[in-house]
């Protein structure tokens, strides 16, 4: 059975369409599994029945490449959208996986900050561009993969998002990177997007043989409590190999520990989102 078909078999009946939940996958520290999480969480959410749009906001375009979308296929990219040359709906391309779609990146994204200069609402370009997709599309999740730095692309992503999902590598300086990100979130809340939430923190590259991983997990769960997902993403060679083949790990090796962890994370994200919506609806009724 082809790997794509094997992943598709996981899918239950899709839930009724509703306004998309926009999550920015962000961490200002590099090498934490940010793009890997964006690719594989997006794939896993699609595998469990959600309709997902992944936006590659990193000029390196690793999320686009990791989903097997070659540069030659990127006719319209996020760059065209942010510059106002094309609507976001024209930039959406289907991947090989049912339920997973992509707005690809372009190296020209690295010049967006200079090109937009002092334009009004330059921090709202992505938010404005996504409004039609959020209002009329039937996506249940929009995931935005950001560059590992605080620049106009990251600010646009946070301004457009409902919440931030933070991948956190189980290493010594993990909390330092998380603290920096929380400061950025507070800055964005204060001036651009007061409703921005923390969706959750996911521990990545966890090695149960290493006492440091357990210590970092404990140190993060202490102050952040239930914000930290129960699911941890293990350090797994198959997860590392998959991008070089232009495939999410769930397609590359569905049965490996990394794939199973991302499926578990996707289910946890969906359950938490249902609980959040139920709580929000209850507040409105009061």
Report the location of each language-model feature.
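P-loop NTP-binding core
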Residues: 1-286
């Amino acid at each position: 059975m082809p790997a794509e078909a094997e992943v598709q078999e996981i899918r239950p009946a899709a839930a009724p369409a509703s306004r998309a939940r926009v999550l920015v996958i962000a961490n200002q520290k590099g090498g934490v599994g940010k793009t890997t999480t964006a690719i594989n969480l997006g794939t896993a959410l699609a595998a469990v029945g959600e309709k997902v749009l992944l936006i590659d906001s990193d000029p390196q375009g690793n999320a686009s490449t990791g989903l097997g979308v070659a540069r030659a296929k990127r006719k319209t990219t996020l760059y065209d959208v942010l510059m106002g040359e094309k609507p976001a709906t024209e930039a959406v391309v289907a991947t090989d996986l049912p339920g997973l779609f992509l707005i690809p990146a372009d190296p020209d994204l690295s010049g967006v900050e200079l090109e937009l200069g002092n334009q009004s609402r330059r921090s709202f370009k992505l938010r404005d561009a996504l409004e039609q997709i959020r209002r009329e599309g039937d996506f249940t999740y929009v995931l935005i993969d950001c560059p590992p730095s605080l620049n106009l692309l990251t600010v646009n992503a946070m301004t457009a998002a409902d919440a931030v999902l933070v991948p956190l590598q189980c290493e010594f300086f993990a909390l330092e990177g998380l603290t920096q990100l929380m400061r950025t979130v507070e800055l964005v809340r204060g001036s651009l997007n007061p409703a921005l939430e923390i969706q959750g923190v996911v521990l990545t590259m966890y090695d149960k043989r290493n006492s440091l991983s357990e210590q970092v997990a404990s140190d993060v769960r202490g102050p952040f409590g239930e914000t930290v997902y129960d699911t941890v993403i293990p350090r797994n060679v198959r997860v590392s190999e998959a991008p070089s083949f232009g495939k999410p790990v769930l397609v590359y090796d569905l049965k490996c520990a990394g794939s199973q962890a991302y499926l578990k994370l996707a289910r946890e994200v969906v359950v938490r989102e249902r609980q959040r919506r139920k709580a929000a609806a209850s507040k409105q009724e009061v």
